[in-house]
Amino acid sequence: MSAVSREGDDWILRLYIQPKASRDLIIGLHGDELKVAITAPPVDGQANAHLLKFIAKQFRVAKSRITLEKGELGRHKQLRISQPQQIPDAVAAALG
């Protein structure tokens, strides 16, 4: 499975998360995943909450339209985004 795929109006992102980074950024492809740096530490769900907020802002959707499907406790995650209003350049490039 590739880093970015589509199922109807939903986008599926396979992510590799780098917590405690200096800034929030979608870095680009990292193997078969998209690497995303976030400033939040991986403690008590802070990184997941921050990731969802950051991705929601990047795709211009409500946080409620993003589902963390896999990887709640690890760096490798899978997100489903329902009907994004905007596609960030790094994500569009990964889609090909």
Swiss-Prot record:
One of its GO terms (cellular component) is cytoplasm. It comes from the Bacteria. InterPro entries: DUF167, YggU-like_sf. Pfam families: DUF167. Belongs to the UPF0235 family. This is UPF0235 protein NT01EI_0281. It comes from Edwardsiella ictaluri (strain 93-146).
